Amino acid sequence: MQAEKLAYYPFISEASAHVGDLGISLESLLNSRAYRTARARGIERVKEALEGEIKKPPVSEEAQVLSELLSYPFARMLVACVDDQLFTRRYALAEAKAAYTFLRNETPDFLLEFGEDFGISAEIRDSHFSMHFTDYIRFSNSLKEPSWKLTNRQFRAGKIKITKEEFARLLEEAVRERIEQSFPIPEIPPEVSAFCAPYVAEIKEQFEVQKKKFGATDFGAVEPELFPPCISHALANVQGGVNLAHSMRFAMTSFLLNVGMSVEEILNLFNVSPDFDAEKTLYQIEHIAGATGNEYKPPACDTMRTYGNCIGKDGLCAKISHPLGYYERRIFLKNKEREKEEGKEKGNEEKKEKREEHEKKNEKGNEIKEK
C-alpha cells in the first residue's frame, strides 16, 4: 500500500510497520524540530476527536504524509496520558468515523484487503459482499438499526449478504474496537508523561467542558458508582458515543428512569451518539417512562443474560436477580457503612467528652489540694 494511503489508515499493521521502518526514535518524535508539525497535528487530532470529527485533509507531498503518519502515535501518547475510559471511547469512535469517510469510497478489493488486517474473511459475489456470520455479529452488535438484525439478513451456508457500503460500515466498527482495546497502555515512559503534561492538562479541561455540555456526569441524587456492572458498561458505551443494541438500550433507559433520573437527563446522555435523533430518542424515553400509560421496569438478570447484556458480573451479582435489586442492595450497604462510621465518630466524641470531664475533675481536685 502506498504511503499516502497509509496516512489515512495509520492504525493498520502495514502503517505501523512503515513507521517502524523509518527508524525515528521516541526522543526525536518528542523533541526534534523536524517533527514539530507532526506533534501539532497529533494534538489537533485529539482535540478534534473531542468535538466528534477528525478532519483529514488530502496529503500528497512527502512531508505531509510523514506528518500525518507520525501524528497518530503522538495522539495515542496523549490519549494514554489522559487515561480516561470515556475519553478513550470518544477518541476511538472519532478515528473510526474518519476512516469510514474514506473506506466507503475505496474499491471492493481494497476493502477485502483492509478487512483481512482485522481478521475478517469476506468475498465478493456479483454486486455484493459475503462474510461469515460470526464476523457479522461481532461488528454489527452495537448497531441498533433494525436492518442490522440477523433476522433481517440473507443467511446461507453460514454467510451473510451485505452491500459494499455496509461492509465499510462494519470495518468502521472493527477500527473502533481495535483502537479502543489498545488502551490503557500499561507503562508510559516518564519522558512521555513529562512532555505531554501541558497538552494533557489542556485536553482534560476541554474534555470536562464537553462532559458538562452533554450531561455525562450530572446524575443529581442518583449514585452511578453503585450501578450494577451491566448498566455501568452500557453507560460507558453511550457516553463514548457507541450505539447500544436495542435490548440494552431499553434495559439501561428503564433502569435510569426507575432510579430517579429525568427524561431530560437521559436524553442528554444519548446526545453523544453518532446517529443521535433527538425527537426519536425523546419519544422512546417517554414511552418507557410511561407517557403512553405503561411504565416499564428494567428486565431481570435472567433476561439480561438471554440477550447477552449481562456483562462484568461481580460477587454481589451472584446474590441478586434484578439490576434494581443490585442498586438497592449497594445503597443499603453504603448507608449501613455510613451509620457504622457515624456510630464510631459518636462513640469517639463521647469518649473525648468523658476524658475532658475527667481531666477537669482532676484539675479541680489538684487546685483544692494546693489550697
Curated annotation (Swiss-Prot):
One GO-annotated biological process of the protein: DNA replication initiation
UniProtKB keywords: 4Fe-4S, DNA replication, Iron, Iron-sulfur, Metal-binding, Primosome
Cofactor note: Binds 1 [4Fe-4S] cluster.
InterPro entries linked to this entry: DNA_primase_lsu_euk/arc, DNA_primase_lsu_PriL
Cystine connections: none
GO molecular function, one term: 4 iron, 4 sulfur cluster binding
Binding positions for [4Fe-4S] cluster per the UniProt entry: C230, C301, C310, C317
This protein's record includes keyword Mitochondrion: no
Pfam assignment, any one: DNA_primase_lrg
A GO cellular component entry from the record: primosome complex
UniProt keyword Metal-binding, yes or no: yes
Reported cofactor(s): [4Fe-4S] cluster
Region Disordered, annotated ranges: 337-371
Domain of life assignment: Archaea
Quaternary structure (record): Heterodimer of a small subunit (PriS) and a large subunit (PriL).
Task performed by this protein: Regulatory subunit of DNA primase, an RNA polymerase that catalyzes the synthesis of short RNA molecules used as primers for DNA polymerase during DNA replication. Stabilizes and modulates the activity of the small subunit, increasing the rate of DNA synthesis, and conferring RNA synthesis capability. The DNA polymerase activity may enable DNA primase to also catalyze primer extension after primer synthesis. May also play a role in DNA repair.
PANTHER family registered for this protein in UniProt: DNA PRIMASE LARGE SUBUNIT
Stored HAMAP family: DNA_primase_lrg_arc (MF_00701)
Similarity comment: Belongs to the eukaryotic-type primase large subunit family.
Name of the protein: DNA primase large subunit PriL
Taxonomic placement: Archaea, Methanobacteriati, Methanobacteriota, Stenosarchaea group, Methanomicrobia
